[in-house]
Amino acid sequence: MCGIFGSTNIKTFRELYTKNSERGNFVRSITMLFPGGMKNDIRVSTKYEQDFDKTIEENPFCIYYLGHVQSPTSGVRDFHIETSHPFNLKNKYIAHNGVLSNHEELIQEYNLDIKSKVDSDVILPLIEKIGFNDAISTLQGTFGCWYYDANHAELRIFRSGSTLFSNGGDFSSIQVSDEYKDITEGSVLIYNFTNNTFNKEICVSQ
């Protein structure tokens, strides 16, 4: 079991982390998104940590904080970055909560180049191969994901089977309050960095 969560506000993000940490205490990742045009032009930065008591530091330039807490996978019990979330490929990033049931079939069917034995590692190569909508509709099993395309500065969240809630601007695998509403299965919410809300929805058939 794992958990995903995100917020623009560091205080809220820390609270979401505390709530979600019960879903995974093996390794955590903190991913920060930055605007374009900065001197070093770094758009995404991720820290992987196993010290769950360490304070999550604020970065004044971060425009969105994304998190993932992970339990050991069924096949991997040691910490390795290549088997930890988020996975990344060609400036695209994804963190996944759940278990895919058809990842081995997808690897064979689409001749995907997978670097690890973790089921989540199939998602980005599949998106690269057949496109986002077709890839998501092809997945079977359970998943709640955040996905960021740094090439287009586009943040998306979606789920099928796994829990995922949002209050409009923040999201979490755990419903931390009544303000957080269940995200409809088969819907993909797209974040608007201007008004700081997930206010665009597309439907993907399952």
Question: At which residue positions do the language-model features occur?
Answer:
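N-terminal segments that mediate ammonia production and transfer
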Residues: 1-206
